[in-house]
């Protein structure tokens, strides 16, 4: 039997803006989770020093809010890049509109999750199931931002958070908005 060499070619999949988005997003999620835990359940730290020097909780909140803005505008940039990036970054790659994409979703489930097939699904970039899951994750990013800015709107008179003030009553109040915000944090941690 004669062995055949596979012809390989290099494909540039993950453009620099996508890589930057990914790592900025990862750093933001870590910072937001840590500061979010502290905001949700602040430790009781007693200090004999002047109050000016022990304004640590205000600093934690400030870091959380600034990072939230970075997270949101990084997400807005990724939305934009989904229209102008290469074919692997575009939205039509993430939204399975074609029959072939749905077929690949089922094939990946059979191979990687159910393990009833042995032949791996070859894909350049994300396979169709991963793309679909990332599309859902983008919606989770949006909902996380909406709930966060909606909760922040009550404490801020700034223009931008006020754009989201309508979301908290729509969700049934502060408690439900906070619960959704908290649940999505755990989704990102586990994802």
What is each model feature region?
Residues 1-191:
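Membrane-embedded alpha-helical bundles that constitute the cytochrome b-like, heme-associated redox core
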